[in-house]
């Protein structure tokens, strides 16, 4: 499994199978009986919950040169899903899912980014940037998106996979706060009380 969450007494696991699997496994926590498997898209990677809904992101293919990067909304009641957009990174805060879709040109290590959010309570997709990116970040290779659960601050990591990366911090309203150096290829921020 690539990602796992708990929702309403069940574990939901996305199975990528090294790019060849397409299943969402559902396990009852009380019995831990054999998993129910639902076919979704190929090569899922992340799963999260917002507003009692499940959001799944992944590669959508095992063809490295042709990933469609779907982000889908999964309905646990009907066991169906619908695509809400493309995304490489997603995070949730206050029942809003924030998504970054990036296209990278590895010849010159530059990227272009599309940002949007999805309100799980109203089922509204907002197709505008949720942070005010500094100029350097607009073309950097983004490697992570995390949100501080206490105050809603966004943390976006960027790097080139060979030198130390940078973390860009934004207020909940998207205002840029600071940039600081971190290790190579930042993947997540962990928040400790």
Locations of regions flagged by a protein language model:
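Predominantly soluble domains enriched in secretory-pathway, periplasmic, or organellar proteins
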Residues: 1-193
């Amino acid at each position: 499994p690539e990602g796992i969450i708990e929702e309403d007494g069940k574990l939901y696991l996305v199975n990528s199978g090294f790019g060849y699997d397409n299943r969402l496994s559902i396990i009852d926590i009380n019995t831990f009986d054999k998993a129910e498997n639902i076919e979704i898209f190929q090569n899922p990677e992340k799963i999260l919950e917002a507003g009692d809904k499940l959001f799944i992101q992944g590669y959508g293919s095992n063809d490295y040169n042709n990933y469609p990067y779907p982000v889908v909304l999964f309905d646990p009641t009907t066991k169906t899903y619908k695509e809400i957009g493309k995304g490489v990174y997603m995070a949730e805060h206050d029942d809003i899912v924030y998504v970054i879709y990036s296209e990278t040109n590895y010849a010159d290590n530059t990227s272009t980014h599309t940002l949007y959010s999805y309100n799980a309570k109203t089922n509204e997709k907002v197709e505008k940037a949720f942070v005010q990116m500094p100029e350097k970040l607009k073309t950097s290779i983004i490697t992570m998106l995390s949100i501080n659960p206490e105050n809603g601050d966004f943390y976006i990591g960027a790097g080139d996979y060979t030198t130390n990366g940078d973390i860009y911090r934004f207020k909940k309203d998207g205002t840029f706060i600071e940039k600081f150096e971190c290790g190579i290829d930042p993947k997540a921020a962990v928040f400790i009380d």
